[in-house]
Amino acid sequence: MSTSAVTEPVDIVARLQSAGSAEEFFELLGVAYDPKLLNVARLHILRRMGQYLAGEDLEHLPGDEAAARCKAVLERAYADFVASSPLDQRVFKVLKDAVAPKTPKRPAFVPLDALK
């Protein structure tokens, strides 16, 4: 497990936006992670974090509270993939579409009076 202390919460959102890897997200927020799991599900975890953060209003929070909220959201997203696989979670559209019920194609209708 890798972990690091939470950095000073000076504009944590800007620091996360400039992060270049999933590992940087975990290190900036001080969240422990298993490198093997992160190698498999990094994009899925970050996408899920983004989905969870979309419902948060971090702009008006003090820096330390925003950092704590981001940390909690990343821990929640990571926990989703500890408990199940990316295939089970289906975060991305291509995975959702793979199991979506297909609408049956209706045969083309040609009324009899249109035939000559």
Swiss-Prot record:
Biological process per Gene Ontology, one example term: nitrogen fixation
Keywords: Nitrogen fixation
InterPro entries documented for this protein: NifW (IPR004893)
TM helices/strands, residue ranges: none
Pfam families linked to this entry: NifW
UniProt keyword Methyltransferase, yes or no: no
Keyword Transferase: no
UniProt family annotation: Belongs to the NifW family.
Its job: May protect the nitrogenase Fe-Mo protein from oxidative damage.
Record note on quaternary structure: Homotrimer; associates with NifD.
Name the UniProt record assigns to this protein: Nitrogenase-stabilizing/protective protein NifW
